[in-house]
């Protein structure tokens, strides 16, 4: 469908209440043509024709619902979509400009003559794998000192001294706590993090969540994990959401099983 052409003289001579003809919108395939009339700074009537290419993409339900809100203020008579005269789409970007002196002061700690590598065997300015003393008595002595240090750390539990959490129980460290985590499965491919947050935030506060996605397409794999702050909220999520209908699918919610 091609945009309908009208006589400019007819449009100018037409009698309108506000002095301006109404806006027109014509859709031609994947393109949308919008014709608007306004007065310029000199008080002359001008005609503005804008063409848009219509693209379809999947957005979260919160964004789709927000687009159906009734416009107000200066945009109450605008058509769907943002108006550049009343709407600012971009985010504010704060920039901090620094002078040449500040830039030099920020890079004073970078010494070009300082070696980037340090050998753990002889403390030289080279990597340990390229040390000329590798395999000699000096190398064996450094390994013995490292083993003695590790043994001393292991004995701190008996002496009552503080041990960092990452050194407790050997190299195993602390295991992940899944006592308040639930697994939500049978999710649709269009599920997003915003939709998942909208689904669980009414039950109770949560510390983190994970939505499994395909690496290539970025679509949801069909399951997600939510770690609640309190176990009672996790139990309520299992009771309320299990068997709950969401996006034309029946959700399956269960306790997260600990990793072996």
Swiss-Prot record:
Signal peptide: none annotated. The gene is eIF3g2. GO terms for molecular function: RNA binding; translation initiation factor activity. Belongs to the eIF-3 subunit G family. This is Eukaryotic translation initiation factor 3 subunit G-2. Keywords: Cytoplasm, Initiation factor, Protein biosynthesis, RNA-binding. The keyword Cytoplasm applies. RNA-binding component of the eukaryotic translation initiation factor 3 (eIF-3) complex, which is involved in protein synthesis of a specialized repertoire of mRNAs and, together with other initiation factors, stimulates binding of mRNA and methionyl-tRNAi to the 40S ribosome. The eIF-3 complex specifically targets and initiates translation of a subset of mRNAs involved in cell proliferation. This subunit can bind 18S rRNA. GO terms for cellular component: eukaryotic 43S preinitiation complex; eukaryotic 48S preinitiation complex; eukaryotic translation initiation factor 3 complex. It comes from Drosophila grimshawi (Hawaiian fruit fly). It is found in: Cytoplasm.
């Amino acid at each position: 469908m091609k945009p309908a052409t009208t006589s400019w003289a007819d449009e100018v001579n037409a009698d309108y209440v506000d002095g301006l003809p109404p806006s027109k919108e014509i859709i031609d395939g994947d393109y949308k043509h919008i014709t608007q009339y306004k007065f310029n700074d000199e008080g002359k009537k001008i005609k503005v024709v804008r063409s848009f290419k219509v693209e379809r993409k999947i957005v979260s339900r919160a964004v789709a619902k927000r687009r159906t809100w009734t416009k107000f203020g200066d945009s109450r008579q605008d058509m769907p979509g943002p108006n550049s005269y009343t709407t600012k789409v971009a985010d504010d970007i704060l920039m901090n400009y620094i002078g040449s002196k500040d830039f030099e002061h920020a890079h004073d700690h970078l010494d070009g003559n300082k070696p980037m590598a340090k050998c753990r065997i002889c403390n030289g300015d080279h990597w340990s794998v390229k040390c000329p003393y590798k395999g000699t008595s000096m190398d064996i002595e450094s390994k013995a000192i490292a083993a003695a240090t590790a043994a001393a750390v292991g004995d701190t539990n008996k002496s009552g001294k503080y041990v960092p959490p990452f050194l407790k129980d050997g190299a195993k460290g602390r295991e992940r706590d899944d006592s308040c985590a639930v697994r939500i499965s049978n999710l649709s491919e269009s599920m997003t993090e915003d939709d998942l947050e909208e689904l669980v935030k009414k039950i109770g506060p949560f510390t983190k969540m994970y939505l499994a996605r395909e690496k290539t397409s970025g679509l949801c794999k069909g399951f997600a994990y939510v770690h609640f702050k309190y176990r009672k909220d996790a139990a309520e999520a299992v009771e309320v959401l299990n068997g709950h209908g969401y996006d034309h699918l029946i959700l399956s919610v269960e306790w997260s099983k600990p990793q072996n």
